[in-house]
């Protein structure tokens, strides 16, 4: 933000805004009323994210093993993220997880989670058997909108109050709890 003349903000201000689109994040953080200014901030963020920001991601302890077991048990895994698809794929590849996922759906400035899920459903996703697993209320709300079950997780960027308030079908406090929720292999 500083490189475009905006005041730098503390991580504590950014963290609660992670999840919705970058346009929402920057409209909240920057004193900028114009769409053009927001788009410049988004472009600058993506420039840095594409060069090094993606590599700053970290895996949560136990997630690779949980994902591997879910996949081995016949669950079809997908990613529905606010990140652009190319960034999400690069992150999955960086961690050696890309082969576990059937699809990656990415967001954009004008594409939110609800729109992403609507597109996935129109492309054949069965909402009656799908489960959205997410760390933010926006994930749970998007699932509710489309009649998809949801599991809120308490690791990541959301917190207990936010997740509980969004009313997911289940709440997991640790990654391996997902294996308890989805213990039966898919036939």
Can you say where each PLM-predicted feature lies in the sequence?
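Helix-loop "lid/cap" segments that line or gate small-molecule binding pockets
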Residues: 21-35, 91-92, 119-122
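A short, structured active-site edge motif that brings together acidic residues
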Residues: 98-112
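Active-site neighborhood of HAD-like aspartate-dependent phosphohydrolases
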Residues: 1-16, 30-35
């Amino acid at each position: 933000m500083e490189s475009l003349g905006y005041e730098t903000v503390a991580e504590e201000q950014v963290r609660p805004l992670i999840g919705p689109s970058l346009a929402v994040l920057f409209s909240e953080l920057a004193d900028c009323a114009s769409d053009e200014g927001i788009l410049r901030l988004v472009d600058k963020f993506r420039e840095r994210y594409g060069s090094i920001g993606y590599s700053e991601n970290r895996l949560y302890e136990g997630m690779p093993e949980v994902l591997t077991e879910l996949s081995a048990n016949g669950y079809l895994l997908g990613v529905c993220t606010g990140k652009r698809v190319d960034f999400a794929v690069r992150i999955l590849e960086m961690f050696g997880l890309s082969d576990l996922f059937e699809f990656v759906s990415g967001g954009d400035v004008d594409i939110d989670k609800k729109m992403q899920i609507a597109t996935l459903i129109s492309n054949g996703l069965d909402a009656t058997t799908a489960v959205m697993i997410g760390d933010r209320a926006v994930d749970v709300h998007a699932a509710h909108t489309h009649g998809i079950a949801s599991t809120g997780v308490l690791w990541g960027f959301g917190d207990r109050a936010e997740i509980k308030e969004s009313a997911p079908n289940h709440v997991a406090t640790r990654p391996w709890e997902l294996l308890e929720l989805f213990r039966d292999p898919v036939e």
